[in-house]
């Protein structure tokens, strides 16, 4: 049986690591994109020979070019059965006081980095008539206050996925989007760190302007684990997107996403009032 190669960006930790290990166990030859060699060595030690680390920073044109050369060598004419765009980062804080360089970096990773990765590896996906799975978020369907930059980057990912799904259909290439809500083990680390960084970047007088919503949202984040999705649920969605004869265009993952999508469908005024109630 010919090997089924799948490239996963952002495999060093969290969801990306879980995906890489699980797909290696399910018969894929996983090419795990990592930024540090040590992270790759750790993954390889745990997964065995079905996983090969590839140094890949989606925000670096040079790194992408080198990774493309390496992946071509590793796949030896088989192409990519799957490309999973998982690398991403979060930033939370008032839009008014978010530095432009932070905004640029979030979009460089979450949007431009995904586009550059697809552009670089699409010939290999086409060669295998493979699949593309983009890891988005419920934030790509519902805009939360104080997450405007992250929201915008995920809405952009949803839009480009919709366009790409139609553009690539003539070659039999399927494009799916996975939309997790809070995920266990990641949510406190990522959300609290990003939230703390946003808060710490403010001058004391600026911080005072937003003290109430900061306090409310900090409490909300601390309780998100109660409805957080297990990594396994996200992995299942990715696996289905890579293997199903009829993959979905979108996979909502987690109990919280079902509830939040109900909120997203409300009239604007009602939705705004509900969101305002969370922060005031």
Region locations from a protein language model:
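Substrate-binding pocket helix/loop in short-chain dehydrogenase/reductase
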Residues: 94-95, 102-104
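C-terminal beta-strand-loop-alpha-helix "lid" module of Rossmann-like NAD(P)-dependent dehydrogenases
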Residues: 171-222
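The beta1-alpha1 cofactor-binding region of Rossmann-like NAD(H)/NADP(H)-dependent oxidoreductases
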Residues: 56-69, 100
């Amino acid at each position: 049986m010919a090997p089924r190669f799948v490239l996963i960006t952002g495999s060093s930790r969290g969801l990306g690591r879980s995906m890489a290990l699980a797909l290696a166990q399910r018969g894929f030859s996983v090419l795990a994109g990592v930024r540090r060699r040590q992270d790759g060595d750790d993954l390889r030690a745990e997964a065995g020979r079905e996983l090969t680390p590839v140094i890949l920073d989606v925000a670096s044109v040079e790194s992408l070019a080198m990774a493309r050369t390496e992946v071509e060598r590793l796949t030896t004419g088989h192409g990519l059965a799957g490309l999973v765009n998982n690398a991403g980062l979060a930033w939370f804080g008032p839009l008014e006081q978010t530095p432009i360089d932070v905004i640029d970096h979030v979009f460089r990773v979450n949007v431009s980095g995904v586009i550059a990765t697809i552009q670089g590896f699409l010939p290999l996906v086409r060669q295998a008539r493979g699949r593309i799975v983009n890891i988005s978020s419920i934030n790509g369907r519902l805009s939360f206050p104080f997450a405007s930059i992250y929201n915008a980057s995920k809405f952009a990912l949803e839009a480009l996925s919709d366009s790409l799904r139609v553009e690539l259909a003539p070659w039999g290439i399927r494009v799916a989007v996975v939309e997790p809500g809070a995920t266990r083990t990641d949510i406190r680390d990522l959300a609290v760190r990003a939230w703390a960084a946003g808060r710490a970047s403010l001058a004391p007088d600026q911080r005072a302007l937003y003290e109430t919503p900061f306090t409310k949202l900090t409490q909300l984040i601390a309780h998100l684990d109660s409805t957080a999705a297990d990594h396994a649920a996200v992995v299942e969605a990715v696996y289905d997107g890579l293997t199903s004869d009829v993959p979905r265009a979108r996979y909502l993952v987690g109990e919280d996403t079902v509830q939040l999508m109900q909120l997203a469908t409300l009239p604007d005024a009602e939705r705004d009032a509900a969101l305002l109630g969370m922060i005031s």
